[in-house]
Curated annotation (Swiss-Prot):
It comes from Microcystis aeruginosa (strain NIES-843 / IAM M-2473). Signal peptide: none annotated. Cell wall formation. Its main location: cytoplasm. ATP binds at residues 130-136. One of its GO terms (biological process) is cell division. This is UDP-N-acetylmuramate--L-alanine ligase. The gene is murC.
Amino acid sequence: MKTVKKVNFNGQPFHFIGIGGIGMSALAYILAERNLPVSGSDLRPTHITQRLQGAGAHIFHRQEANNLALFHSPGPQNSSQTVPQVICSTAINDHNKEYQAARDLGYPIFHRSDVLAALIADYDSIAVAGTHGKTTTSSLIGYVLLEAGLDPTIIVGGEVDAWEGNARLGQGRFLVAEADESDGSLTKHAPKIGVITNIELDHPDHYQNLSEVIDTFHEFAHQCQILVACLDCDTIAEHFRPTISYSLDPEKGADYTVSEIIYEQGMMKASVWEKGSYLGQMEVKIPGQHNISNALAVVAIGRYLGLEFAVIADAIATFAGAKRRFEHKGEANGITFIDDYAHHPSELLATLAAAKLKVEGKQYQRSIAIFQPHRYSRTTAFLEEFGSAFSSADVVVLTDIYSAGEVNINHVTGQQVAEQVRKHHKNAYYHPELSSLGQFLLEILQPGDLALFLGAGNLNQVIPEMLSLYREQLAVRV
């Protein structure tokens, strides 16, 4: 287990460098809701920083050393009550002015994972890990516990309408948290219940190979009192021995499994089995077999906590999903617009397969995949896999790569991704610039299309523009 620094929750201030990020803001929100002094910097105001301000956090829209002085009060030099605990993510480097000032002044500096680990230790915690499905699974666990009256604290990597953001502070004994493996900090967490949805090589900026990823998950698994894991992942089935297992395949001998998966009237439906005994039918709003799997993990956890299956199933049936996870953004000119965070080849395959269910269920004419590759390192590592990831789409449009702050040391481009896709797909287009993508898509999209905007970058910003363009066209016709 990695050494976890001691975080002070007894009144010492917190200052977050880059407080508007999805992971940082969730932690800051919980601390502010606990009535702890919280400040942070982010270069531009967003609805996330506005929510933090509403919770009592002080937000600076500049990054400079003076920001650290907000809560500094007279007293013994560097007294625990007079200086802030400075919180950083992996994205913050030594050149950041606030980081430099905190280091030079001897202020305590923590990685955001240290704060999450300390919060996990404060509760009966459920931590959800895995290469894919973390946000949906952790959000759904939180939602089920909330609907069951257990009033959980929730920290996830996406925004959920049920608690109007990416975090909520409850008064119950449970904390549900999304546990990120991307930088190896997963090994700091020791929850009561750990969940592993699947394990694949991702984040090649940190991991050299799958073996290193497995080692990280192994260390996490050993620190969980109860491990819940999916046997549909070959890596898990081969290398892990979960306390509680689940699988979509009844032949794998898992504790929880399903049969008779169907798509009907906009819902995924499946019969659920617990150690060979029939529990009942489960309905899931968010499409795709991978979301049946995510929901099955939630059933396993709910049952372990003593919840009746009917309570769990009723909650699952009303869960609308997290934002940017097959999120319906609107309709215009007979075209349906979907925003999804998929950015790994496996995620793209799963999302586009789910879109096919939607096409059959809603009778859309075509599925149009608009994809923005995310990070140069990931694009380089999975270039060939991206080529074959779009087989379920009728048309593919690719943009240039969203860097996420990386340096392009391998000189990889979106054009190369497009070339790989064209080896497998005859209707693939490359349009690098987002600034003119909306106009380009006007020439491609047709009434009856399902337009899927895919990626973890800023591609989804084009969707409001598209909706506006179609409204303008309609106004001109009228």
